[in-house]
């Protein structure tokens, strides 16, 4: 049996040694691979600079590719996955992605800081990874040393066994030691396998980190491109800002010029008012003069009345004479009609005779033409005779040839052809003669028609002539036709003598007829001459009569000339007055031209403003597009964040599944432990049976000593072989140590290179900080410029207010002047009514005179008609009469025009009355609005005072709350306090930004209202100026008309004098009222100035309160510094926190009441409402801080890193928002200046502004209600989160207690086992090992902190998505998971209490040490160096925690 057991032991030892050698070889190979990869990574990181990232990304090295290929082999990767590393990688990826999205959103210089921070974080991650690898290497070295130590122990044990084999009783002890050695070897195998798994995992991590490095480099390239684009955009924005500032300066200059122009216009208006006053004084003087003239005219009227009576008498006598003259005229007219008839007859006869003479002359010309034609016909006849002679000769020759019979036919044909030719020639001649005769007949017929129309006697003569002519023509035609016929029938028989005799006879008959006609015409002419002499005698008689009548006409004309002279005098006076009117019209036209030029300039300025508004709109549209892009990117980031959140949830689920698997594994290990215990019990029973067998076998042992000696020799041989193998392993281990030393030297060199790179990057960070300081300085300068611009705007507003006051004064003066004008118009109406009555009477008289003149005119027209027809000498008289008639027509037209003017003036007066009524109504409405506004101002002042009191009370309450918060903040550490300070500063910035936005909106609304008011006022001023000019025109026309009417009218002047005196009295009273009104307006202006001064004082007080708040915040910072020293008093302050919470609740109830009051105040004033909303938000935030501070005392260290990242992101966002708001503010300032230039075109829009204010108040109410709802929802979410945090804290505390107890149990078990199985000399090692492990156990408690930190980070990550919709579901899931954990932990605690109780204070011993270490260091988050120090601290803690986890896992494997 012993031999078999020894063989079995030798075989097992051989197998174990072979497995150990194989494991060592694989470990060496993997260590070489990892060291080679680390060496390559170090060289690449040292060689690659930030500018060469793109080249590295584009061309990776061959060594890196080989390492990746070697590391990605399936033999090295294996099946294992390291879940915590996955978690870390995913969280880092998610944070990197979030940072990417944020970098894409931000368009400011903070992106450089983000890049530096990202690079720093990546470097820290690489360092962590390198540190993990180094720690793994160290752990492997320690394990190898422990294996070597165990081998030495085994050698010692073997020696002990050799010494013990001499004694037969020590064999079971050796067997037990062999069993222990086998267990230790199996544990070492497990450790080596775990080391292999870790190496594989480290290789995977290296691969993943290489991928992450490549991605980081690509991201750096992308970020550089983005930075270039952002820098370009920033330059463009700066250019646009500079252009906008330049435009603003130009607009301010234009605005100043416009102010000067408006001031000049106002001066001109004042000058015109003075001129009008002077004109009124001149009018009064003129009225006095006119009264004097009226007195003179009265005297003249009396004289004229007497003359008028005389003229009436003369008129009556003249009427009688006129009647006589009319009788004579009627007789003369009858004679004239008779003479006209005679003259018409004579003229007709003369015309007829003249026509007869003309016809005779035409006949003579026709005879001459006929003679010429006859001569031509004679010549043709001679030619015909020659032809006949020739034909005769030919006939003779033909007669000779008749004898020849065969030629008869030819002769006959020839004759026929000749006859035809002759006939054709004769027919042509006849046609020509017939055409001439026809033309003569037509002329004669026309003459007949004319003569038959005019006179019967001449018709007879014409009839005789035509009969003679026709008879002659017929005879001629018949003769010619007879001749032709005879020629045709008998051409051969005619001779030359006969033709000549015929022609002579024809000529003689024609001459006789012409002589007869001449005699007849001569007799007719003599008769006509006799008639002409008779007519001339009659004309001479008529001339004598006409001379008598012309003398009578001359007398009448002289009378008319006298009347015309009087009329010309009147016309001269009218022309003088018309000239005056023209001068006044010219002046009015000049003023109208001036006003039109001013209006044109205004229109040009308006067009320029419109163009600039269009530019601003285009810029606003560009800004809106960019804002939409940013919103779109922000929405994308939100979506990505939600996706990441979902991925994190999935990861959490995976981790939960892994935890469940781990729990299952733990349970399985417990089962295995129970099985092992059972095996131990079985082995103990077996040992007892072996003892029995040993007692029985002692007898047999003596027999088998020889066999054992042989077995001992075999064992010695085996031991010698094992010693050889151990020596080989020692040599291999020494080689490994040398290689590890080389690799460690290389790692140190890499560390030095990393430190150099860090120094360089720290220098770059320092440069960036300087640039940031410069930019902040520039921003401060821009803010100062904005403040200066605001000051200038306030000054311009004051100037505008003064101008509005002046405009109000001018309007009041205009209203008073209009009242005076209305009174004067009433007086003029009365005068017009009286004058219209007199005019009607005069017009009736005038109409009677016009009728008489019309009758005379008709008679004169008849006389002139007869005179024109009678002689040419009367034409002069006719022209004179026509001139007189034209003058009378002009007089009529003038009368009609005057009547039309009077009607137009009546219409204008009606229009002016309606306009004056409208103006009076508008003035009344304005006065009412003024009273209403004054009452509203008083009410607002009272409300302001009440609100200021409430603000002071609120400030006092806030001070008390601040003191309480100081006591609460004493609990927290410096890092969290600094973060909260930043958070509060950010919220203050947001509140200030909101206040700025509200103030800008208020200013915009005020500007819009003032613009509208100024536009309406300018429009009304223009209308009123037009009305004034129109009134000036009407007044001047009235003056002209009144002057004309004063000449005609008599009794109205006395009444007008009395009315003018009354008007003067009224004017004096109105002047006194004007002075009183001016004094009242001055008093009102003084009151308004006082109110403005009070408002400025209130603003200063508000600024002082803000400064005090800042000072209080600085005091809070100092007290927060003092908090770090008083951290040990946290436990005592727990009760005080509860009291403060109750006080905060009371203050919260008081603040709710204050909010209600603020809501009421917001309905009245929007500015104070914004301030009160800010106070509410601050109070709410501080309450939330108090609750969080009370609830998050135990989790302060865990949330620091996450809050820093969060606050930095928020600071970047807010800084970008601040930049965007500054740009928007600059744009709004530009638009404000442009709108300020438009201010002077608006007036009286208070009704619309009141409606707008009411609508805005309703909107503000709705927004406040929505904000209150959101605040209540946020409170609920915070409470839910606080519950989740409390549950997590409790669960973590329970886990930490469990872990410490389990560690104590394990340490106790190890101590007991070491004391059992090892002898006295080897107990020192077992004592040394727990001593070395005891700090690990103490540090193992930090593993729980690390886990707790992870949990808190997950919670804070969920806090980042504070506005996500899935928060409620997450909180519910977390609560359920924590409840499960609590249930499991309570069961574990109960089992732990049964096994080994341990105090709670021992588990928390390492915590205060770490806290003191953390608190001893100063965390300056205001600078990048302080933040980097803090990050390095956390990295070290993470390294320590990872080392502790590794040691804990190794100890668990050993157990």
From Swiss-Prot:
Keyword terms of this UniProt record: Coiled coil, Cytoplasm, Cytoskeleton, Phosphoprotein
Residues making up the signal peptide according to the UniProt record: none
Residues with the Phosphoserine modification: 47, 1356
Highest taxon listed in the record's lineage: Eukaryota
Compartment(s) where it occurs, according to its Swiss-Prot or TrEMBL record: Cytoplasm, Cytoskeleton, Microtubule organizing center, Centrosome, Centriolar satellite
PANTHER family: COILED-COIL DOMAIN-CONTAINING PROTEIN 18, SARCOMA ANTIGEN NY-SAR-24/CYTOSKELETAL PROTEIN SOJO
Protein name: Coiled-coil domain-containing protein 18
Taxonomic source organism: Mus musculus
Gene name for this UniProt entry: Ccdc18
């Amino acid at each position: 049996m012993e031999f078999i057991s020894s063989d079995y032991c030798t075989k097992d030892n051989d197998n174990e040694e072979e497995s150990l050698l194989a494991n060592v070889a694989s470990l060496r190979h993997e260590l070489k691979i990892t060291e080679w990869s680390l060496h390559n990574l170090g060289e690449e990181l040292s060689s690659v600079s930030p500018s060469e990232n793109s080249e590295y990304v584009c061309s990776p090295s061959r060594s890196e590719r080989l390492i990746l290929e070697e590391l990605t082999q399936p033999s090295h990767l294996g099946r294992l996955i390291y879940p915590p590393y996955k978690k870390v990688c995913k969280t880092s990826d998610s944070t990197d992605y979030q940072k990417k999205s944020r970098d894409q959103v931000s368009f400011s210089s903070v992106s450089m800081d983000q890049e530096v921070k990202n690079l720093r974080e990546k470097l820290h991650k690489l360092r962590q990874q390198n540190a993990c690898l180094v720690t793994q290497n160290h752990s492997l070295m320690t394990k190898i040393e422990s294996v070597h130590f165990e081998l030495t122990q085994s050698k010692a044990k073997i020696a002990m066994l050799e010494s013990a084999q001499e004694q037969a009783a020590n064999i079971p002890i050796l067997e037990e030691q062999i069993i222990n050695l086998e267990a230790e070897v199996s544990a070492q195998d497990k450790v080596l396998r775990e080391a292999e798994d870790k190496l594989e995992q480290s290789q995977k991590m290296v691969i993943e980190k290489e991928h992450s490095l490549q991605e980081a480099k690509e991201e750096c390239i992308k970020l550089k491109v983005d930075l270039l684009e952002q820098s370009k955009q920033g330059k463009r924005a700066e250019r646009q800002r500079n252009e906008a500032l330049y435009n603003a300066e130009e607009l301010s200059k234009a605005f100043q010029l416009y102010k000067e122009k408006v001031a000049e216009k106002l001066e001109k208006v004042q000058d015109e008012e003075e001129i009008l006053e002077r004109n009124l004084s001149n009018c009064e003087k003129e009225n006095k003069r006119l009264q004097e003239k009226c007195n003179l005219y009265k005297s003249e009227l009396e004289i004229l009345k007497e003359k008028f009576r005389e003229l009436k008498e003369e008129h009556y006598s003249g009427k009688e004479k006129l009647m006589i003259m009319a009788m004579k005229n009627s007789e003369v007219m009858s004679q004239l009609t008779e003479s006209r008839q005679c003259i018409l007859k004579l003229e007709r006869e003369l015309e007829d005779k003249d026509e007869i003479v003309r016809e005779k002359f035409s006949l003579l010309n026709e005879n001459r033409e006929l003679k010429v034609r006859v001569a031509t016909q004679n010549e043709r006849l001679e030619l015909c005779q020659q032809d006949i002679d020739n034909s005769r000769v030919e006939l003779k020759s033909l007669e000779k040839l008749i004898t020849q019979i065969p030629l008869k036919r030819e002769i006959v044909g020839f004759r026929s052809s000749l006859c035809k030719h002759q006939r054709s020639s004769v027919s042509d001649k006849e046609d020509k003669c017939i055409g001439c005769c026809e033309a003569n007949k037509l002329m004669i017929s026309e003459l007949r028609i004319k003569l038959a129309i005019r006179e019967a006697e001449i018709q007879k003569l014409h009839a005789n002539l035509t009969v003679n002519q026709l008879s002659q023509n017929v005879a001629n035609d018949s003769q010619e036709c007879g001749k032709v016929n005879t020629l045709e029938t008998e051409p051969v028989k005619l001779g030359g003598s006969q033709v000549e005799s015929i022609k002579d006879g024809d000529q003689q008959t024609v001459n006789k007829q012409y002589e007869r006609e001449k005699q007849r015409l001569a007799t007719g002419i003599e008769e006509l001459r006799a008639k002409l002499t008779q007519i001339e005698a009659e004309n001479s008689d008529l001339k004598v009569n006409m001379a008598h009548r012309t003398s009578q006409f001359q007398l009448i004309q002289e009378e008319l000339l006298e009347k015309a002279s009087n009329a010309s005098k009147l016309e001269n006076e009218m022309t003088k007055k018309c000239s005056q009117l023209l001068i006044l019209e010219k002046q009015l036209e000049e003023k109208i031209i001036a006003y039109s030029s001013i209006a044109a300039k205004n229109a040009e300025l308006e067009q320029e403003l419109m163009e600039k508004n269009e530019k601003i709109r285009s810029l606003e549209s560009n800004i809106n597009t960019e804002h939409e892009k940013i919103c779109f990117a922000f929405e994308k980031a939100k979506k990505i964040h939600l996706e990441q959140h979902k991925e994190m949830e999935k990861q959490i689920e995976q981790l939960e599944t892994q935890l469940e698997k781990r729990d299952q594994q733990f349970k399985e290990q417990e089962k295995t432990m129970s099985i092992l215990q059972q095996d131990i019990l079985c082995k103990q029973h077996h040992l007892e049976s072996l003892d029995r067998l040993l007692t029985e076998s002692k007898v047999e042992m003596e027999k088998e000593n020889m066999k054992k000696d042989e077995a001992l020799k075999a064992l010695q041989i085996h031991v010698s072989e094992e010693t050889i193998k151990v020596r080989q392993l020692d040599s291999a281990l020494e080689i490994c140590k040398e290689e590890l030393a080389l690799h460690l030297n290389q790692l140190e060199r890499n560390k030095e290179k990393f430190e150099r790179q860090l120094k360089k990057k720290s220098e770059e960070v320092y440069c960036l900080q300087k640039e940031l300081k410069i930019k902040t300085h520039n921003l401060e300068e821009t803010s100062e410029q904005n403040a200066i611009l605001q000051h200038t705007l306030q000054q311009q507003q004051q100037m505008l207010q003064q101008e509005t006051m002046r405009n109000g004064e001018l309007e009041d003066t205009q209203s008073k002047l209009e009242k005076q004008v209305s009174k004067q118009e009433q007086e003029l109406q009365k005068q017009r009514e009286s004058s219209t009555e007199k005019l009607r009477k005069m017009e009736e008289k005038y109409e009677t005179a016009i009728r008489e003149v019309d009758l005379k005119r008709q008679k004169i027209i008849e006389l002139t008609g007869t005179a024109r027809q009678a002689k040419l000498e009367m034409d002069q008289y006719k022209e004179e009469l026509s001139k007189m008639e034209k003058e009378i027509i002009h007089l009529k037209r003038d009368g009609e025009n005057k009547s039309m003017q009077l009607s137009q003036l009546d219409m204008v007066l009606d229009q002016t009355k309606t306009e004056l009524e409208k103006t009076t109504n508008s003035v009344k409405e304005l006065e009412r609005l003024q009273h209403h506004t004054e009452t509203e101002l008083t009410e607002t002042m009272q409300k302001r005072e009440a609100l200021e009191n409430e603000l002071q009370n609120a400030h006092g309450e806030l001070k008390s709350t601040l003191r309480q918060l100081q006591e609460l903040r004493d609990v927290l550490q410096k890092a969290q306090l600094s973060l909260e300070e930043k958070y509060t500063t950010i919220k203050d910035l947001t509140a200030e930004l909101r206040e700025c936005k509200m103030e800008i909106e208020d200013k915009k609304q005020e500007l819009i209202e003032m613009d509208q008011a100024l536009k309406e006022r300018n429009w009304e001023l223009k209308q009123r100026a037009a009305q004034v000019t129109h009134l000036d025109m009407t007044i001047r026309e009235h003056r002209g008309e009144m002057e004309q009417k004063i000449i005609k009218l008599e009794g109205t002047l006395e009444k007008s004098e009395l009315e003018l005196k009354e008007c003067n009295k009224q004017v004096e009273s109105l002047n006194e009222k004007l002075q009183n009104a001016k004094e009242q307006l001055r008093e009102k202006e003084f009151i308004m100035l006082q109110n403005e001064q009070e408002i400025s004082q209130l603003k200063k007080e508000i600024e002082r309160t803000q400064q005090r708040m800042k000072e209080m915040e600085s005091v809070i910072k100092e007290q927060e510094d003092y908090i770090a020293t008083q951290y040990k008093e946290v436990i005592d302050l727990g009760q005080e926190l509860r009291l403060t919470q109750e006080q905060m609740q009371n203050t919260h109830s008081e603040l709710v009441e204050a909010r209600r009051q603020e809501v009421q105040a917001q309905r009245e004033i929007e500015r104070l409402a914004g301030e009160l909303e800010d106070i509410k938000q601050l109070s709410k935030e501080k309450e939330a801080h108090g609750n969080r501070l009370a609830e998050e005392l135990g989790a302060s260290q865990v949330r620091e890193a996450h809050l820093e990242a969060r606050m930095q992101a928020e600071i970047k966002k807010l800084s970008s928002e601040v930049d965007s708001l500054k740009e928007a503010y600059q744009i709004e300032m530009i638009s404000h200046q442009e709108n300020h230039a438009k201010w002077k075109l608006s007036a009286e829009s208070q009704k619309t502004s009141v409606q707008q204010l009411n609508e805005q108040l309703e909107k503000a109410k709705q927004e406040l209600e929505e904000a209150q709802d959101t605040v209540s929802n946020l409170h609920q979410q915070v409470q839910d989160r606080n519950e989740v945090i409390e549950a997590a804290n409790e669960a973590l505390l329970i886990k930490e207690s469990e872990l410490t107890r389990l560690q104590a149990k394990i340490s106790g078990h190890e101590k007991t086992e070491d004391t059992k199985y090892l002898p006295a000399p080897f107990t020192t090692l077992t004592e040394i090992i727990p001593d070395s492990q005891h700090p690990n156990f103490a540090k193992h408690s930090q593993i729980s902190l690390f886990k707790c930190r992870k949990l808190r980070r997950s919670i804070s990550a969920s806090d980042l998505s504070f506005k996500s919709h899935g928060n409620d579901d997450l909180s519910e899931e977390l609560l359920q998971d924590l409840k499960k954990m609590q249930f499991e932990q309570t069961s574990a605690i109960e089992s732990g209490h049964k096994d080994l109780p341990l105090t709670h204070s021992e588990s928390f011993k390492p915590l205060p040490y770490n806290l003191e270490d953390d608190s001893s260091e100063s965390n300056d988050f205001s600078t990048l160096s302080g933040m980097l120090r803090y990050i390095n601290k956390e990295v070290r803690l993470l390294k320590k925690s990872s080392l502790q986890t590794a040691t804990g896992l190794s100890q668990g494997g050993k157990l």
